[in-house]
Regions:
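Conserved catalytic core of nucleic-acid polymerases
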Residues: 205, 209, 282, 339-340, ...
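C-terminal structured "cap/appendage" subdomains that terminate the fold
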Residues: 607, 611-663
Length: 674
């Protein structure tokens, strides 16, 4: 039965026939569904105009506009209840604005995202699953709701039958939906990660409402410096082109402008490709298309590349971290909205919002994030989080030594690559052989996250033969990591997914296709493989000769025909296998690291609630492996200890053999607290 709870019954009687009751008449169990309709998207400048509650038997709309009920009137009836919502992160923000902080919530959108992480919807052209309310209701219960009124309900409110029906529908079968999803969560072994994420979104909603403190004056000064730096690099680029490529020099005399001008626009990728080609800097990607993307041009050692990348970085600071941010400052704070999870369980920012996770880490930028007057910033981060997690999962000896003894992994890899360093300790290598340590650094990161010899060949411009030698050296140093990765891979291709922390799972992309290709490839005999390789070489030979303008006739036409008939399924099979192997090394580490930070944030938020520090100790950002808080000066030591302890507890909860370190500091800005 549907009921409207209002002080203005006559208003709704003009719209249609409805059932009515009072707040006291509501029959609510321990678990209820909840939704809110609001006048806009942001709690700091909008409000709730109705709350909908559902029990599975009855649904209630409580009206909160036109001098009707207030949210505080509803609070006594929902305090202590378990609340089920869909994207309840949104509703929590508005409830927090009314000083109501539910202790236990569940979210059907989170459940859907966790269940179908990485999976493809076979009923929708194998596109990724969608998780909006309508899509989940249709998929799980076969119920189709008309969501047309969703776009305008903040304007028309409950003034027409369709918006009233829409509001009832949002809670009508929500408990049933949650029960169906929960059965799948339990049978699939997802319960622990689901519970964590439902606990975590309470903290995430708080972080959204806290906002990130920023000094508008400091940001404006940074903007001025960034523009000046960008113009400086623009001039460097233009003068270099003028001096070295006379065909692009504008020689027309201008009595009022003595600059070295060029007749090419450096903001035009098409025109700049011609400039790069004139410098004989390769611009072809793996598909043969021209690009001046960093990953393509950085393979060249030409000095113009370094200048260009410096200009691009300077320009990026202006276009992305300049006026765009400044315009969104509200009372010396920035706000954003988060997506609770991506496929690695990491946090992300919702599309169209400021990306709090992507601010440059330089001191100039970070020092713009200044605590409000009388406050300080408290920052705590993990020490080598991903190395610790990878070492704990894999048991790799080199990584474990790095965690336990403080060994430098870049130095360890440098010793393998450069035998002359074998007898030197870390300190000597860092001081006297910085170039060789640096040479080991980039490939080591690439390999640790599932890259291959081909990856560093493409990204670093290293000859392929040398890249294979470097890869083999890394595999020798980190044999334990690869042995573990192979085990994860072998389990994953049997199950069709990678499992990591708390039952978090990632469905292998295009797994059905992989199995199809695998069957066909495994059916190829030894003799057929010989023919395939022979045909491949002959096919490549003809291609190379034609590129040189020379005629070439196949020596082994039958082998070439066989190669061409099999090359798609063979290449696709090995491409997917390589992608899976990369994911098996990377995803479990990323997912476990994400769970560590989410548990730490949840512990901290619960502590803030329990100790009545709401809106005093604020969680203002969590980025990768750190938590950033703001608090009054007199609470800085209490906050420092609490953040540090939360991170240690959350981090070590997910480790079996090792311990992780976390160090907190405070200062007037994010940068000075690091």
């Amino acid at each position: 039965m549907n009921y409207i709870i209002t002080k203005n019954r006559s208003y709704f009687e003009k719209i249609g026939e409805y059932n009515y009751c009072s707040l006291e008449d509501m029959i609510l169990g321990d678990v209820i569904s909840l939704d809110t309709e609001t006048t806009g998207l942001q709690p700091r400048n909008c409000d709730i105009f109705c709350v909908q509650l559902g029990t599975g038997d009855n649904n209630y709309i409580i009206v909160m506009y036109n001098d009707d009920y207030e949210f505080k009137d509803v609070v006594p009836y929902i305090t202590g209840k378990t609340l089920i919502g869909h994207n309840i992160l949104f509703d929590l923000g508005f409830m927090y604005n009314h000083s109501f902080y539910p202790e236990k919530v569940y979210d059907t959108m989170l459940a859907s995202k966790i269940l179908y992480n990485g999976a493809e919807d076979k009923d929708n052209y194998s596109l990724p699953y969608t998780h909006d309310f309508g899509a989940v209701m249709k998929r799980e219960l076969g119920v189709v709701y008309d969501k047309t009124d969703q776009k305008n309900i903040h304007l028309v409110k409950l003034s027409q039958p369709s918006t009233i029906e829409y509001s009832f529908n949002d809670v009508d079968r929500l408990i049933e939906l949650h029960n169906v999803l929960l059965d799948k969560i339990d049978s699939g072994g997802f319960r622990d990660t689901y519970n964590l994420h439902c606990r975590y979104i309470r903290a995430l909603a708080y972080m959204e409402q806290c906002g990130l403190p920023i000094s508008s004056e400091a940001w404006k000064n940074k903007m001025i410096e960034d523009v000046e730096n960008s113009l400086k690099w623009k001039q460097v680029i233009e003068e270099y082109i003028y001096d070295h490529l006379p065909q692009y020099a504008d020689r027309q005399i201008d009595m009022f402008d003595e600059r070295k001008r060029i007749n090419v626009s450096i903001s035009s990728p098409l025109q700049m490709i011609k400039v790069f080609n004139a410098f004989k800097i390769p611009t072809k990607d793996k598909d043969g298309k021209d690009s001046i993307n960093e990953s393509i041009i950085s393979k060249s050692k030409h000095e113009f590349v370094k200048m260009w990348l410096s200009f691009q970085e300077a320009n990026h600071r202006v276009t992305t971290f300049g006026e765009t941010i400044y315009k969104q400052i509200e009372n010396e704070r920035l706000y954003t909205n988060f997506n609770p999870m991506v496929d690695t369980a990491r946090l992300s920012t919702r599309k169209g919002n400021i990306n709090f996770l992507n601010f440059p880490s330089d001191s100039v930028t970070r020092n713009c994030f200044v605590a409000n007057k009388g406050n300080v910033m408290v920052v705590c981060d993990y020490s080598g989080q991903e190395t610790v997690v990878a070492a704990d999962l894999s048991g790799d000896k080199a990584m474990t030594a790095s965690v336990v003894n403080g060994d430098d992994l870049h130095c360890a890899f440098a010793r393998v690559l450069f035998p002359e360093l074998a007898s030197l300790d870390d300190e000597t290598i860092i001081k006297e052989h910085k170039d060789k340590r640096q040479a080991a650094k980039s490939p080591r990161f690439a390999f640790q996250y599932g890259g291959s010899a081909y990856t560093i060949h493409q990204n670093e411009g290293i000859p392929l033969d040398e890249a294979y030698k470097i890869e083999n050296a890394f595999k020798e140093l980190h044999a334990g990591l690869y042995e573990w990765g192979d085990k994860v891979f072998n389990v994953a291709i049997k199950k069709g997914y990678i499992e990591s922390a708390d039952g978090w799972k990632l469905t292998l992309p295009k797994f059905d296709k992989y199995l199809e290709y695998k069957e066909k490839v495994e059916a190829i005999t030894k003799e057929q493989w010989q023919m395939y390789k022979q045909g491949k070489l002959d096919y490549k030979k003809k291609f190379d000769e034609q590129e040189k303008g020379r005629k070439y006739d196949y020596i082994y036409p039958i082998a070439v025909k066989y190669y061409k008939s099999k090359k798609t399924e063979v290449s696709q099979f090995f491409k997917l296998k390589s992608e899976y192997q990369r994911l098996c090394l990377n995803n479990p580490v990323q997912a476990r690291s994400a769970h560590q930070l989410k548990l730490a944030t949840s512990i901290l938020f619960d502590w803030i609630i329990q100790n009545n520090y709401i809106n005093q100790i604020k969680i203002v950002n969590t980025i990768h492996d750190e938590i950033v808080c703001e608090c009054p000066e007199h609470l800085k030591d209490i906050a420092k200890e609490a953040v540090e302890q939360a991170m240690l507890t959350g981090g070590n909860h997910y480790l079996t053999n090792l311990k992780i370190k976390a160090d907190a500091n405070y200062g007037e800005s994010w940068g000075k607290a690091k």
